[in-house]
UniProtKB/Swiss-Prot annotation:
InterPro entries: ArchSynthase1/Queuine_TRR, TGT, TGT-like_sf, tRNA_ribo_trans-like
Cofactor binding: number and manner: Binds 1 zinc ion per subunit.
Cofactor section: Zn(2+)
Protein name: Queuine tRNA-ribosyltransferase
Catalytic activity: 7-aminomethyl-7-carbaguanine + guanosine(34) in tRNA = 7-aminomethyl-7-carbaguanosine(34) in tRNA + guanine
Length: 370
């Protein structure tokens, strides 16, 4: 089930609600990534406290470990993981295509060797829909092919057209499995506007509950990513949620929302947290730097997260330098809270029809330095 309601716009920025089988989401929204069914260094209650409304699970990795038999025993990911709010799962395609020489792409699907034990496996649109039906994720993604950041037009066109054929097969299999959740199609076409338009038209003809923009933030220059976003964003259907996959930095999120994107996911806040790279409204803090060893201030004096309420930069510096797992946990709490607060601030700015002013203030603050 999916019901999307658009409440307000400010320029191209959109404020909406997305009703799913496991809850209602306020958009625009950021989805923390729980690759193996857990957001790294977080428990579900801590994740909830950051303001997270929905998380992402990885179809490829969950299929390999623990496997469908195990997750099926629990009736899906929600009871297995203890996260009872909505979950989106990707199709598994990106991970398979990242295997390089270990995989072979055909019209039928992708043959590959398991990176865990070397088993020969096959992922098709139908198999991806089967896996995601067992996972019982609230939002299911079609299987698509993601090209590298910059390829020639002919290569991008052939890949995009195969993704469209896979989209049709994904739609058919999703319906055959009587999956009660929502299915999103994925716009591909690399950096070429004509291919993106052809892809979007094909997906619209097939019929999906939401539309994702894929194939960005995969190695192309940032100005090119923003160009495609500015061209494609306003073309997306107004009555469906728009999802920008695998993006990104705080600046990327603001740029995405400015161009009509409603949903984002990225490993950046959690991965960077474990590496001591912390986001604040005043710019980024690399907590390993010696300048923070006796800094008594919190990361951000205006942040209300557990980490900023209780701990100093000096203590976080110490935890990172000594490799304490508590440091990774506290850093992750802060980064995810920062991302969720950023989304809440954008929702409020759209409601007040002041998003352009918010953008200016956001960039000015981030440039100031922490």
């Amino acid at each position: 089930m999916l019901e999307f309601t658009l409440h307000k716009t400010s320029g191209h920025a959109r404020r909406g609600t997305l009703r799913l089988n496991h809850g209602t989401i306020e958009t625009p929204v950021f989805m923390p990534v729980g690759t193996y069914g857990a957001v790294k260094a977080m428990t579900p209650d801590r994740l909830d406290e950051t303001g997270a409304q929905i998380i992402l699970g990885n179809t490829f990795h969950l299929w390999l470990r623990p496997g469908l038999d195990v997750i099926g025993t629990f009736g899906g990911l929600h009871d297995f993981t203890g996260w009872h709010k909505p979950i989106l799962t990707d199709s598994g395609g990106f991970q398979v295509f990242s295997l390089g020489d270990l995989r072979k792409i055909t019209e039928e699907g992708v043959h590959f060797q398991s990176p865990i034990n070397g088993d020969k496996l096959f992922l098709s649109p139908e198999k991806s829909m089967e896996i995601q039906t067992v996972l019982n994720s609230d939002i299911v993604m079609q299987l698509d092919e993601c090209t590298p950041g910059q390829v020639d037009h002919a290569t991008a066109k052939a890949s995009m057209q195969m993704s469209l054929r896979w989209a049709e097969r994904s739609r058919r299999a999703f319906d055959d499995y009587r999956n009660p959740n929502a299915l999103f199609g994925i716009v591909q076409g690399n950096l070429y506007l004509d291919l993106r338009e052809e892809s979007l038209k094909g997906l619209t003809d097939i019929g999906f509950d939401g539309i994702a923009v894929g194939g960005l933030s995969v190695g192309e220059p940032k100005p090119e990513m923003y160009r495609v976003l500015r061209e494609v964003g306003p073309m997306l259907p107004a009555d469906k949620p728009h999802y920008l996959m695998g993006v990104g930095t705080p600046e990327d999120l603001v740029e995405g929302v400015a161009n009509g994107i409603d949903m984002f996911d990225c490993v950046m806040p959690t991965r960077n947290a474990r590496n001591g790279w912390l986001f604040t409204r005043w710019g980024d803090v690399k907590i390993k730097n010696a300048r923070y060893k006796d800094d008594t201030r919190p990361l951000d004096e205006q942040c209300s997260c557990y980490t900023c309420r209780h701990f100093s930069r000096g203590y976080l510096h110490h935890l990172h330098r000594t490799g304490e797992i508590t440091g990774a946990m506290l850093n992750t709490v802060h980064n995810l809270h920062y991302y969720q607060e950023l989304m809440a601030d954008m929702r409020a700015a759209i409601e007040a029809d002041s998003f352009a002013g918010f953008q200016q203030e956001f960039h000015a603050q981030r440039a100031r330095g922490a």
